[in-house]
Amino acid sequence: MDVTVQPSEYNTLKPLLLNCERQAFLRDWGDSAFDPVGYVEAKWQTYTPGTAAGRGNYACYSSPKVDELIKAGASEPDPDRRQEIYFEMQRLIHEDAPAVFLYVPQEIEAASARVHGWEPSPDSRINLHDVWLSE
């Protein structure tokens, strides 16, 4: 294997990724909503320029069946049926192997004793709306 590492700023790299002009890249993507729809729409739905569909689909993955399941899961009100839809989607994505899932990043977060109201968030976001500083 012959590899050339090319560090890039994200704004330079993103159009290259969306146009399938890179063979590989490394990045994490946390779940910001505790719901599969936001993640799967961004990462695995077929990229459609000018829409939110596939806005983070840097694997250039396209599957009509997965696209169909994404739409079905997003509009399904029954939690059990919704889970079945997402499990089927997960199975298809796993079989197609559009990406190599390497790791889950570990985070260490700390704050000064002057910081109050802050707690780590399981969705990887830094929520500051309840934070305040003491003297």
Residue ranges and their predicted role:
Residues 1-49:
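Periplasmic binding protein-like
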Residues 1-7, 68, 72, 81:
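A local structural motif
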Residues 25-29, 76-113:
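Bilobed periplasmic-binding protein-like "clamshell/Venus-flytrap" ligand-binding domains
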